[in-house]
Amino acid sequence: MIEKLNAIGISDAMITSTVITAIICVLAIIAGRRIEMIPSGFQNMIELGIEKLHGFFEGIMGKYACDKYFPLIATLFIYILFCNYSGLIPLAGEAPGFQAPTSNVNFPAGMAIIVFFAVQIIGLAEHRGIRFYKHLFKPVAFIFPLMVIEEFVRPISLTFRLYGNIYGEEAVINSFFDILPLGLPIIMQALSVLMGLIQALVFSLLAAIYISEAAEHEEQLPVTEHM
């Protein structure tokens, strides 16, 4: 079955990402059906985590942009986090049909392209048309070519930052499982849990910065410097 899917161009990473999407959707449906007016237990923990995440991004984006675009940022963070953690399962990248999506360059590239077009759409919507692109001529008009290059470098940077870290991490862990005693790979797995979280946070953080810049109006103070 897996070989047939691979033969028609459906990669292992695509299969895994589809499974992860289904898992997240099922978890969201189950959680949605169990929402209580007075939260307790698991719901309380989830709500606390979302509040902390919202507070973190509000400090980066500002209240207006965060309140409006937090669902997009949170979705990116959660989805990439699940994809990163799929690489922690032994034999990820070796078993047929199973590869951490973020260790395949096409997946980070796709996520980066989504962010790129989201920034353009949000900017055009917030500034009601092509006035959004006035920022490409600031502070002086002759830097326009450099500003255009910067816009296209951003998705490339997002792609290879995420891909390089996760691919390298997965390769190292699989090598350690093959050649070292059990204890050390387990320690590496624990460190990888932290690294997977950091990489998901970095990607969504940069996306949040780009989106907040696109949503920023001239009368607002700058949220942050260009990165």
Walk through the language-model features, giving the residues of each.
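Selective transmembrane helix interface/packing segments
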Residues: 1-227
